[in-house]
Amino acid sequence: MSPKLPQHGTVGVRTPLVDGVEKVTGKAKYTADIAAPDALVGRILRSPHAHARILAIDTSAAEALEGVIAVCTGAETPVPFGVLPIAENEYPLARDKVRYRGDPVAAVAAIDEVTAEKALALIKVDYEVLPAYMTPKAAMKAGAIALHDDKPNNILREVHAEFGDVAAAFAEADLIREKTYTFAEVNHVHMELNATLAEYDPVRDMLTLNTTTQVPYYVHLKVAACLQMDSARIRVIKPFLGGGFGARTEGLHFEIIAGLLARKAKGTVRLLQTREETFIAHRGRPWTEVKMKIGLKKDGKIAALALEATQAGGAYAGYGIITILYTGALMHGLYHIPAIKHDAWRVYTNTPPCGAMRGHGTVDTRAAFEALLTEMGEELGIDSLKIRQINMLPQIPYVTMYAQRVMSYGVPECLEKVKAASGWEERKGKLPKGRGLGIALSHFVSGTSTPKHWTGEPHATVNLKLDFDGGITLLTGAADIGQGSNTMASQVAAEVLGVRLSRIRVISADSALTPKDNGSYSSRVTFMVGNASISAAEELKGVLVKAAAKKLDAREEDIEVIDEMFMVSGSQDPGLSFQEVVKAAMVDSGTITVKGTYTCPTEFQGDKKIRGSAIGATMGFCYAAQVVEASVDEITGKVTAHKVWVAVDVGKALNPLAVEGQTQGGVWMGMGQALSEETVYDNGRMVHGNILDYRVPTIVESPDIEVIIVESMDPNGPFGAKEASEGMLAGFLPAIHEAVYEAVGVRATDFPLSPDRITELLDAKEAAA
């Protein structure tokens, strides 16, 4: 099957985002901006302890305070929640026990902020403090108190999987090396703070939430379950959103609490979270220890791989089961590896819950693998770019041992592109002392083909409505979180219909108006919603072509649509304008509404015979190669990235402008994890709950990032497209790791490569000299 090729000049064109004007002019309304003059102020009381039993809560003084309208505790939230139906163990407000410092215990709604804060201070909670475990080692130690009764060893999930004969493959290897790497816990640091505006109509028993989410559908499900409401009485709207990066792919406690307060107060509650509270809500990438073992043949071919990954997952399950499976799932699909062994442990700790973050579950193990592969290649005398070329997939299509199907694979071209752009052959190993080059590969899924809450319905649905004015309304439940999905859906629909982009307006992520969608996570929207948009547009085009053919007294197959004109192929007749055809089409039906859907074929949904293969199952992979040029100050230990060349295989760049922006953002987030970002706790307290202490790179630290688009034309993607946002992130870490080694001769095993870590390595090198 070949992808549909664009013909009308809408797809493949650098296109500003359709909502860009509102954003840059300040007209965009984010959740905190929505007018609600009668809204009460919501506030949350949080645990001061990392681990404790709740013996008693007295809210009487808070309830008696003038201006307090509602007070809620865990007694009113008996239903647990969690993003995975098989692991729901978090309560909106803690019941019986708190498991991290910041765990919500009670909440109030009051007439103003001052009153709300006073009310929180009046709530008395009696705790029995318990030992707290900040690391997997401490949590798994014999005698440690279980955070959750059903997991007495504090291990949420163990994974043990083997593909191929690993022992035999290692026995045949000529070079075997093993190394352990650690990766600090990191946070998304999205620009917009968490916020929910909850409006309850007691007459109609209707609850409306405007909230900062990537997946309105999940919020809808969790609010309905925890509040024990009929889901038909709930409406969830995602206004403009200032980023997500995975943090907002779950229904979170503050959203449920806002709904609870609004219902109890019988009114409207605005619950705005501070930057510290937004950090505490967390869902970041967990601290991970990776023990990586690779066997190579003399010619550089990979014989076998064995990895062990241990993650500190935080206090609740969240995405943990999926995250730990992903540590091994994406060892497949990038290189040809005949034998793979994957052992992993996701461990509960008394810290805020971790979750999904850009490159979900794969970044740390990919970085460890790439770093060790580079080091072993050097030991064999093989250039780090060359050793990657040696291990490419042998043919396409390719089915991995994990049952993933690779239908497009632009990695060889990506490597050639960065090789040429960076001057690799001319400059590698020849830069001045203190400066170096490094290279790495990475990849990620174009959406998971096995949704988390799925009853067999299509993976994506898009509706198109055409009325008398000739305007086309595209309705999608997909959440545009800044990545440009509204623009993408408009572009592909306009391309199919042969109309101007300006003719299409998008309504998205409103459960009362738009079809259900599984949301913006795992880079699924372009592939799935894009294909559904094409399906809907083809349906609408069929209606219009039929009307035009009837009007022009021609066969439907002879009708062409060019620049909004419907013409008979080969005829000199000027044809009909779009508006004329709309008028003709509406004669019989009135307003025209059509539906388009997309469903991933079953062969792309994993293999039931392979345990866990639903995780990592996808329609296609985005691939990336990147070269990083960096320098190291040997006095301060500061690592500076000067230039990044990144070639990214996106199948087809539907909007090259957006692809470049998303790729640069992915590289930039990789740089943060590689060089400076780190979550630190002091007796359970997050010590960096602000963007001054949490070291996100600024524009000052950002290098020049040259994006090179590679188009492998995936046969199943919309016009050949795949994801273009996550596949490049992981490669930055091992690429700069190699650049640092070339610059000053030290190889770190702990990330980030912060000045203190680098100076320690330099001091040790000097002492050993």
Swiss-Prot record:
Listed InterPro entries: 4hydrxbenzoyl-CoA_Rdtase_asu (IPR017607), Ald_Oxase/Xan_DH_a/b (IPR000674), Ald_Oxase/Xan_DH_a/b_sf (IPR036856), Ald_Oxase/xanthine_DH-like (IPR016208), AldOxase/xan_DH_MoCoBD1 (IPR008274), AldOxase/xan_DH_MoCoBD2 (IPR046867), AldOxase/xan_DH_Mopterin-bd_sf (IPR037165)
Catalytic activity: oxidized 2[4Fe-4S]-[ferredoxin] + benzoyl-CoA + H2O = 4-hydroxybenzoyl-CoA + reduced 2[4Fe-4S]-[ferredoxin] + 2 H(+)
Notes on how activity is controlled: Inactivated by low concentrations of cyanide in vitro.
Required co-factors: Mo-molybdopterin cytosine dinucleotide
Cofactor: binding details: Binds 1 Mo-molybdopterin cytosine dinucleotide (Mo-MCD) cofactor per subunit.
Binding residue positions for Mo-molybdopterin cytosine dinucleotide: 214, 244-245, 522-526, 650-655, 722-725
Protein's UniProt keywords contain Oxidoreductase: yes
Record-level Gene Ontology MF annotations: 4-hydroxybenzoyl-CoA reductase activity; iron ion binding
Keyword entries, A-Z: Molybdenum, Oxidoreductase
Post-translational note: The N-terminus is blocked.
NCBIfam families, A to Z: 4hydrxCoA_A (TIGR03194)
Protein name, as recorded: 4-hydroxybenzoyl-CoA reductase subunit alpha
